[in-house]
Every structure is written in C-alpha cells, then in structure tokens.
C-alpha cells in the first residue's frame, strides 16, 4: 500500500467525469422490468447496512476492526461491491480519518486488479501448486460447518450469523474460511459457493 499511496494525488480521488462520455453508449429502449422474484430470488426480510459511514467507526477502525463483539467495521462492503458508494469519495473522506481503513480500501482494489488480470483465480488457486492439495471434502463436516454446528464457538457463531443475517464480521470470515480449508481440509470452492448462496 505504500507504493500505491506514493503515487496517489488529488486527481485520483476526484469523481470521474463520466457524464460527458455518456453519449457514446448504445441507445436502447429499456425492456420490461423484471423483479427479483422473477429472477429466482426470494425475499428473506433481511436488511442491508446503509451506505452512510460513521466517522467514529472509521476513526476507531484500527483498534476495533478485529473485535467481532463491537461494531468496529464499516459494513460498506456490499455497497463497494455493487458500486452504490464511490470508492474515490470514500477514500478521499475516510483516508484522512484512519490510515488503516485507507489501506483496506487499497487491498480491496488490489484484489479487484488480480481478478481482472488473472481471471482464472475465480475457479483455480492463484499459485498452481495449491490446486494439487488433497482435500478431504467430508460432506458431513461441511454440512456441520454450513449450519454452524462444528463445536468451535467462534466458527459456529460466525456461520449462524451469516445464515440468519447475510452478514459476517470480516475477522470471523477469515477464521471460518481458514477453519474450513486448514482444519477440515475442505476445498475452498465449497466454502465460496456457500458464501455466495
């Protein structure tokens, strides 16, 4: 992140002037609007975090981000993922509040670039030798992991939170993913598919 910040200027944090380029887009009449249910989605009554960020959360991010029992994360990941909040605006505003938070935004963009330049990582390991891992892939253990019934309290709490709210604290996500792959020796793609579900 030091190299990234070394070349960062105010220009990079300004909103991109895309309106003047909109005339280059293909003009089409919109088709009928298809609702989420028609696409196979089911309303679960879950609410997404708002896209407003709290300065206090960002200020305390370094100290509180790894503590699952406090609201120490921004909960903006869904908005960053789908572009409903501007990464440039967030970096410009939040970067001055907490360097650690800015570093996390940089890491996010780094992995976006990995996906762009190495699209095979969607279904394969980045390092080919990791594709030779002999996974156990025990279906009973995987079902227990999915349900939050492993007997490991933090893993179970994280999976139950995910199953009931659609959210899991970042540090807990790392713990449950590591548990799945390194303790249970279950292929990471199984876990990824469950998280995407």
Where are these regions (language model features)?
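Active-site-proximal binding-pocket segments
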Residues: 72-197
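Glycine/tryptophan-enriched, flexible segments
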Residues: 2-130
């Amino acid at each position: 992140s030091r190299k990234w910040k070394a070349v960062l200027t105010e220009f990079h944090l300004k909103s991109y002037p895309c309106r003047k380029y909109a005339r280059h887009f293909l003009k089409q009449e919109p088709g009928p609007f298809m609702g989420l249910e028609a696409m196979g989605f089911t309303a679960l009554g879950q609410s997404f975090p708002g896209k407003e960020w709290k300065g206090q959360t960002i200020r305390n991010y370094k100290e509180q981000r790894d503590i699952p029992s406090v609201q120490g994360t921004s909960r903006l990941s869904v908005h960053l993922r789908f572009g409903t909040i501007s990464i440039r605006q967030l970096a410009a505003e939040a970067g001055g509040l907490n360097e650690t938070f800015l570093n996390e935004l940089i890491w996010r963009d780094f992995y976006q670039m990995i996906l762009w330049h190495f699209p095979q990582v969607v279904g394969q390991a980045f390092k080919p030798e990791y594709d030779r891992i002999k996974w156990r892939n025990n279906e009973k253990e995987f079902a227990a992991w999915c349900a939050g019934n492993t007997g490991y309290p933090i893993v179970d709490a994280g999976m139950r939170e995910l199953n009931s709210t659609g959210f899991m604290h970042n540090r807990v996500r790392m713990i449950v993913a590591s548990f799945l792959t390194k303790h249970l020796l279950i292929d990471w793609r199984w876990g990824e598919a469950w998280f995407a579900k």
